[in-house]
Swiss-Prot record:
It is an enzyme of class 1 (oxidoreductase). This is Epimerase family protein SDR39U1 homolog, chloroplastic. It comes from Arabidopsis thaliana. Putative NADP-dependent oxidoreductase that acts as a positive regulator of chloroplast division. May play a role at an early stage of the division process. Residues 1-37 form a transit peptide.
Length: 347
C-alpha cells in the first residue's frame, strides 16, 4: 500500500501491476478511491520559502508548516543561527540557505512568506531608522526579483508579505480598516514602501499583505519584555495608558498566514489584528490580573523618550485597527479577547 503513495506511484503503476500479475485494467474495490486520496494529499503539500524564519513569528510558522508535513526552505543571512534554531534532528528535511543560495530555494517553491526586518522596539538613531526601512525594502525587493526572474514553471504562485498597522499612523480617536488611508509619520512611510515593493511581484503571483499589530506570545514580542516587570511587582501602563493597543495572539497570526498560503481568496491587504483592540492601560490591567500582580507603576512619557528617543512613538502612540477583511473571509480567531489570549499564554 505504501508504494501507491510514493512519488513514483503514477509513473510505475504498470510495473507494479505486472509484478503482482494483476491486469492493468483490473481494479479492486476501494483501490481507485485510495489512490485518489493519496494523490490529493500529495498535491496539497507545499514547499514554502520563509524569510525572517528565525524571528518570533517565523519560528512559530515553521513549526506549524512542519507539523503539517510541508517542505520548508529557510532564507537567512545567518546559517549558523538558523541551524541552532532549527536543528536537523527536530526538523528533518528542512533547507537552510544563505543569501547566495536563495535563488535555488525560491525557484520551485509553492509560496514565499516574507517576514524579515529589523525590530523597531529600540532606540532610533538616524542609522537605525535607515536600517529599519532598508532591511525591509532590501529583503522584499530581493525576494520579489527572485520570484519574477524564476522560470514560469518554477515560479512561486503565492507571496505572503508582512507589513504593519503602523501604515495607518496613530490616533486615539480614529478607527482603521484595510480601506483607511495611510498616515504621514515615519512608520507609515516605511509600511507604504514595504507594501509597494511586495506588490511589484509578477501579475500571476497572488500577493497577500498582512498588516500586523502587536503580537502576543510568551517567547517574544512586546509581552516577553513586559512580563518580568509585572512578576517583580513593577508593572504598569506605558505613558498615559490611553493609547490604542491593536494586538493579536501569535497562534492566530500564524493561522492567518497559513490560511493566506492555502486559500486563493486571501489577497491584497488583510489586517493581522484581533477583533477587539483595547487601550494599553486595560491590557496592562488584564496582564496583572492573569499574573496575580498589580498594574500600578506607570512608566512616564519622559522616561520612555529618554530610553528610546523617537522610538518611544511605538509604545506611546497607537491606533485602533479592525480585521474587517479577515472577518469577511470567514477567518476564525481563536483569541478574540485579550484576557483569553493572556490566560492561554501564561498557562
Amino acid at each position: 500500500m505504501e508504494l501507491l503513495c510514493s512519488p513514483t506511484s503514477l509513473s510505475s503503476s504498470f510495473a507494479l501491476s505486472s509484478a503482482l500479475l494483476v491486469p492493468r485494467s483490473f481494479s479492486m474495490p476501494g483501490t481507485r478511491r485510495f489512490m485518489v486520496l493519496c494523490s490529493s494529499q500529495k498535491e496539497s503539500q507545499m514547499t514554502v520559502s520563509v524569510t525572517g524564519a528565525t524571528g518570533f513569528i517565523g519560528r512559530r510558522l515553521v513549526q506549524r508548516l512542519r507539523a503539517d508535513n510541508h517542505a520548508i526552505r529557510v532564507l537567512t543571512r545567518s546559517k549558523s543561527k538558523a541551524e541552532q534554531i532549527f536543528p536537523a534532528k527536530d526538523f528533518p528535511g528542512i533547507v537552510i540557505a544563505e543569501e547566495s543560495e536563495w535563488k535555488n530555494c525560491v525557484q520551485g517553491s509553492t509560496a514565499v512568506v516574507n517576514l524579515a526586518g529589523l525590530p523597531i522596539s529600540t532606540r532610533w538613531s538616524p542609522e537605525i531608522k535607515k536600517e529599519i526601512k532598508g532591511s525591509r525594502i532590501r529583503v522584499t525587493s530581493k525576494v520579489v526579483d527572485l520570484i519574477n526572474n524564476s522560470p514560469a514553471e518554477a515560479r512561486p504562485t503565492v507571496l505572503v508579505s508582512a507589513t504593519a498597522v503602523g501604515y495607518y499612523g496613530t490616533s486615539e480617536t480614529g478607527v482603521f480598516d484595510e480601506n483607511s488611508p495611510s498616515g504621514k509619520d515615519y512608520l507609515a512611510e516605511v509600511c507604504r514602501e514595504w507594501e509597494g515593493t511586495a506588490l511589484k511581484a509578477n501579475k500571476d503571483v497572488r500577493v497577500a499583505l498582512i498588516r500586523i499589530g502587536v503580537v502576543l506570545g510568551k517567547d517574544g514580542g512586546a509581552l516577553a519584555m513586559m512580563i518580568p516587570f509585572f512578576q517583580m511587582f513593577a508593572g504598569g501602563p506605558l505613558g498615559s495608558g490611553q493609547q490604542w493597543f491593536s494586538w493579536i495572539h501569535v497562534d492566530d497570526l500564524v493561522n492567518l498566514i497559513y490560511e493566506a498560503l492555502t486559500n486563493p481568496s486571501y489577497k491584497g491587504v488583510i489586517n493581522g489584528t484581533a477583533p477587539n483592540p483595547v487601550r494599553l492601560g486595560e491590557m496592562c490591567q488584564q496582564l496583572g490580573s492573569v499574573l496575580s500582580r498589580p498594574s500600578w507603576l506607570p512608566v512616564p512619557d519622559f522616561a520612555l523618550k529618554a530610553l528610546l528617543g523617537e522610538g518611544a512613538t511605538v509604545v506611546l502612540e497607537g491606533q485602533k485597527v479592525l480585521p474587517v477583511r479577515a472577518k469577511e473571509l470567514g477567518f476564525e480567531f481563536k483569541y478574540k479577547y485579550v484576557k483569553d489570549a493572556l490566560r492561554a499564554i501564561m498557562q
